[in-house]
Amino acid sequence: MDTTNRTTLIIDGNWLLMSRLGMMMGDFVNTLPAEYLEKAKNEMIDFVAQSINKIINYWGPRIDNIMMVQDGGSWRKTLPKPALITEEYKGNRVADEEIAWNYVWDALKTLCHNFEVNHITCVTEKNIEGDDWCWYWSRYLNHVGINTIIWTSDADLKQLVQRDPTTNAWTVWFNDRSGLVVNEAEQHSDMDMLLNFDAVDPFLEQICDRVEHLTYINPDNIVMSKVICGDQGDNIKALIRVEHTTNKGKVRINRVSEKEWNKVKEELGIKTIEDFKHNKERIIQHLRMLPRFAECKDSMGDLLDMFDYNMSLVRLHKEQIPREFQLAMNKHKDEYLITDLDYLRNNYKVLAAHTEPVEELFKDLPF
């Protein structure tokens, strides 16, 4: 197997910022003086930069470039809603009014500007989510023979793990705590390797050996599960829901569970996203036959519309992302820059203890 060692780390910028904000929330209370908030903003920038540089050093020579993506709004919020939906996509996310968000977003803006100044790719575009960018860059870079590691905690992005059939470049998902997620097609038994040694990618094996936790998945399962079972975090509703009243008079909503969906999926032999798309009526019929959903009164037409709507919200693919936004992203392909990672590594110092002030994170860089 002809493979490539060129590997770019794609940083989910919004996730990285928000995950670090969780540790500094008290420093961004909007009743604090402006000078204190400005200081907190600069500390946030340093904290994020420190996290990035630690991950650069973690991967060492296994990566040779980095880039960051961020949200610019969401085209998904403009999609026509099916009859069974009244809620807004991600409409359940309410910003904490006690937080000075202008300082938080200014930290991200400043960080991205500093990336650009120092020849590090950082892209954003109106109405395009960071998830869309992860899809675009992973597919584009794989197509030109560059591997990608998506650094995030967003489980939706696990659907992007793949190997490009033309170039053999791959995409994997990584989180510091959860470990590495790889397409199950890369899992080889000892017998497989004996029979076809060329099937193994030595460089990907090095990537896998670097982490403590390694998981192989069918990426299509990420999409199928969320389309059927929904996601309360993103305010995506389960495909089939039935209200019922308990003995105590409380109204509950039965939703399709992962266990129920896995059973139906196995019964119907659904293994790929193509199976999923071509059998949606059969899937709905089987789900409605489950005892908990016997009282479902929704029409097949409405449920099919709901199925397609959820697919548009969940699936990161050229079939789902509107062409105008694909073209908008493609205009940025020439903004892919090659970063001098050795320079970043060599100009970074980590103190052994926290008893002294932290030195500049990128010694000569404005982070």
Label the model's feature ranges:
Residues 1-4, 44, 302-307, 312-367:
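Low-complexity, acidic/Ser/Thr- and charged residue-rich accessory regions of DNA metabolism proteins
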Residues 2-148, 157-183, 187, 315, ...:
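Noncatalytic, basic helical substrate-engagement surface that gates or grips nucleic-acid strands
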Residues 19, 50, 54-57, 106, ...:
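Charged/polar, solvent-exposed surface patches and flexible loops
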Residues 62, 151, 307-309:
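Short, basic and Ser/Thr-rich N-terminal targeting/leader segments
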Residues 71, 90, 95, 102-104, ...:
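Compositionally biased, intrinsically disordered low-complexity regions enriched in proline and serine
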Residues 117-120, 270, 350-353:
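Short aromatic/hydrophobic-glycine micro-motifs
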Residues 126, 137-254:
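Long, highly charged, low-complexity intrinsically disordered interaction regions
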Residues 204-325, 354-359:
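Accessory alpha-helical DNA-binding modules that contact the DNA backbone or grooves
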